Amino acid sequence: MSNKGQLLQDPFLNALRKEHVPVSIYLVNGIKLQGNIESFDQYVVLLRNTVTQMVYKHAISTVVPARAVNFRVDDSAEG
């Protein structure tokens, strides 16, 4: 994934992680996972509920926070 693709993704996921916002993650096959984002990198998200699951980003369709989240995007980095 290009750096440009990370401009929205990283600040959004980081805000969810820092604020301990519960999320529902829908996979491309329709499965719904719920928990808190513990960590993430370019390829995976660690989702914590009763256990920690490693979810590959290419399998994720949608991330739905349980509440609104404020996050900043660095506009100067856009091309």
From Swiss-Prot:
Homohexamer. Keywords: RNA-binding, Stress response. It holds the Pfam family Hfq. GO terms for molecular function: RNA binding. Belongs to the Hfq family. RNA chaperone that binds small regulatory RNA (sRNAs) and mRNAs to facilitate mRNA translational regulation in response to envelope stress, environmental stress and changes in metabolite concentrations. Also binds with high specificity to tRNAs. Residues 10-69 form the Sm domain. SUPFAM superfamilies: Sm-like ribonucleoproteins. CDD domains: Hfq. It comes from Cupriavidus pinatubonensis (strain JMP 134 / LMG 1197) (Cupriavidus necator (strain JMP 134)). GO terms for biological process: regulation of DNA-templated transcription; regulation of RNA stability; regulation of translation, ncRNA-mediated. NCBIfam families: Hfq (TIGR02383), PRK00395.1 (NF001602). HAMAP family: Hfq. This is RNA-binding protein Hfq. InterPro entries: Hfq, LSM_dom_sf, Sm. GO terms for cellular component: cytosol. The gene is hfq.
